Amino acid sequence: MHKILVRSNHKPLIGKIKINGSKNAVLPIMAASLFSNSSITLHNVPDLIDVHLMSELLKSLGAEVNFICNKDYKANHTLEIDCSNINNHLISHEIASRLRASFLMLGPMLSRFGRVSTVFPGGCNIGKRPVDIHIKALEAMGAKIEIDSCNITATTKGKLQGKEITFEKVSVGATENIIMSATLAEGVTTINNAATEPEVLDLIEFLKIMGANIEVNNTKITIEGVEALNGCEHKIIPDRIEAGTYALAAIITDGELKLEGVSLSDIECIANELKTIGARVELHDDGIIISRKNGSIKSAHVATNPYPNFPSDMQPQLMSAMSIAGGISIIEENVFESRFAHANELRKLGANISIEKNKATISGIKSLSGANLHANDLRSTAALILASLVAKGETTINNSHHLWRGYEAMHEKLNSCGADIFVSS
């Protein structure tokens, strides 16, 4: 079992941190590489467990994947993908059960080969994230989908058909899946109430470079099917969640961090909320500098919602900061159910948090104390590390393997700025 030991030295974090490419952008783009018979080259790819799992999935289908990974975490990584020899429609059940993004292969495989078999996807256990919305939309486009226990088989006779699809609820994954499904469909597909996160727009940009015909008008996305897509090169956008996490590390420790490779426009919806709790944001040509303005962290009332609002993936980290804020803070979680598991662990550090349905009330205290903690998912692991940076004494975070699904070399980056973090397997 992976463990992370954090020794609080009560030092403000000061230094520079390079922000890697976005995990939530690169995974759907890797799935979209299935469309092309030519080579795909992706730059600014993060070295993460989920990227390696998606690479293994592509290889299991017959693709050639070459991850050019620099040992220096400060360097950029490149991923080369060639799907010209895909010879298998069965997505590995073992890998798919561990990787939620595997479900994004459904649309590309169905569009290109007319058949795909997989299982319900895995990933973080943070409540219900049903795939019914994906399935209903694909069925509307002409797919026949059979579900047997945890197994899913999708087939189509000929091409998928363009349709007008309106999502009852905004869904990033479903939006991405249907965009990809529609690129080679016959006719025009319109998605209403579509997700427009930067990661979705990066996927669209990638598909357009490949030759797709896609237009975005607010939350309406129109895709006109084309005959084929080509190979291309593409640079993955910066990871706004990683940037937001390190921004909070600066605020929590009353330090000053320069986040390199990211601009304010990349994290504007996050930065706006951080300013309400007392963050100072300075713009530079090669990044942004985050620090705390004056005195203690301020309390706030924050609600998570689809983009362009505050993202759910930043909620656990924000709760860590609010644990030592002045006054009473409230967080409303409106995206995922059961995303307050980290609150129980923060309480072990002394945090004063009460939960009622989708609302967390945090009464800020002056200081936290080290404890033995158990991580539940990716973002809660990051949140516990942030809180441990200012908890008196030592904190051990067990089950911390989740962290490497979304953060490359987090302990090294923080240690280079003054933290004292040790990782053991």
UniProtKB/Swiss-Prot annotation:
Binding site for UDP-N-acetyl-alpha-D-glucosamine: 100, 169-172, 313, 335
Active site: 124 (proton donor)
GO cellular component: cytoplasm
Keywords, in A-Z order: Cell cycle, Cell division, Cell shape, Cell wall biogenesis/degradation, Cytoplasm, Peptidoglycan synthesis, Pyruvate, Transferase
UniProt keyword Ion transport present: no
Residue numbers carrying 2-(S-cysteinyl)pyruvic acid O-phosphothioketal: 124
EC number: 2.5.1.7
Catalytic activity: phosphoenolpyruvate + UDP-N-acetyl-alpha-D-glucosamine = UDP-N-acetyl-3-O-(1-carboxyvinyl)-alpha-D-glucosamine + phosphate
Compartment list: Cytoplasm
Pfam families associated with the record: EPSP_synthase (PF00275)
Enzyme class, UniProt record, top EC level: transferase
InterPro entries documented for this protein: Enolpyruvate_Tfrase_dom, Enolpyruvate_Tfrase_sf, MurA_subfamily, RNA3'P_cycl/enolpyr_Trfase_a/b, UDP_GlcNAc_COvinyl_MurA
Keyword Cell wall biogenesis/degradation: yes
Binding residues for phosphoenolpyruvate: 23-24
Pathway: Cell wall biogenesis; peptidoglycan biosynthesis
GO biological process terms on file: cell division; cell wall organization; peptidoglycan biosynthetic process; regulation of cell shape; UDP-N-acetylgalactosamine biosynthetic process
Molecular function via GO: UDP-N-acetylglucosamine 1-carboxyvinyltransferase activity
Function: Cell wall formation. Adds enolpyruvyl to UDP-N-acetylglucosamine.
Membership in a protein family: Belongs to the EPSP synthase family. MurA subfamily.
Protein name: UDP-N-acetylglucosamine 1-carboxyvinyltransferase
Gene expressing this chain: murA
